[in-house]
Amino acid sequence: LLRRGATADPCPPRRGGRRPRRRQPRRGVAIVLVLSALTILAVMLAEFQDETSAELGSALSQRDALKAEYAAKSSVNLSRLLIASEPTIRKALAPLFLLMKQGPPQIPVWEFADRVLGAFNDSEGNESFLSLAGVSISEGKNLGLDGAGFEIRIVDEDAKVNINTPARGDAFSQARLAAQLIGLLSGPQYDPMFSSRDADGQFSDRQAICGAIIDWTDPDQEAYVCDPHSGSAQQAGAEDSYYQLLKKPYPRKNAAFDSIEELRLVRGVGEDFWATFVDPDPSRPEKRVMTVWGQGKVNVNTANPQTVLAVICGAAVPGTPLCSDPAEALKFLTAFDLVKSFTAGAPLFGTPKAFISALKGKGMFGAALSA
């Protein structure tokens, strides 16, 4: 009840404390922002890591390439130094050859380069040097190579038949190569190869291929006849147009070969010819028979048995059993290879006369080669 004159309170007192606030509709926005930021940071970090890894890999690759380059340069310079020291080594061994009643020949130090220079190589090369010299590199200073290594293989190009000698333009160079080529191709076991068609569908016998190789390099326009026993150079008129009649014609070069691979352009030189007379074992360059480098004279001390047999048969009279009987040729190749392995790379002959004497069954190795 209200007293007279009193009025009702328009705002009655609240009960139970404060009135609860209305729930906000944007309550999870902060969580979404945090997750979005973390996602963006993760993507940026992943891209940064990929970019950094790529740059690191590139830097490591450039570092290794630089090490490899200078290791290779070092091996070349060390090899030159070793070859330049050959006269000193030969002089030191002269008394030994005098006891054998022959002058000191050129010592093929390059055949031992990988082992002799192993003292400047990695751990594997150090072990090779230790097995050769019996001396550990720990006893010296500035030896060994960390983080890199090299492998040296030096090949004597004068141990092969030089097919570039006719480019000199003289009859003697032509005749010498003709004799070497005919001696190389003369074995009767190769008859099936020369009696069938070549890759161009043509028949090319021994004389045709021999003449084609010489005509490719000599500067004249006359066809050369390969007959090493004629005693003089023979011409058979103008060079033919064989190369102009091919499906893809090209001119005869009449100049020196730029590389041994260019020999594939010459008439009759197919895969069978290449594998038999040019490069029988590509993984072993010392087995290669022909070359476009060198002086032209074959070094029989470093030549492989097949090349030595070609030199012998090129100078032998027709009908020599060694050149006409495959069994005799095989026997000689085996004996020559055995003698070379027995000497462990040391030169067999001090002079050309010693080589001829050995072929006649005389001298230290004559009995083994003529057996």
What are these regions (language model features)?
Residues L1-A8:
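N-terminal acidic, proline/glycine-rich, low-complexity intrinsically disordered segments
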Residues R4, G17, R23, V29-A371:
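Compositionally biased linear targeting/interaction segments
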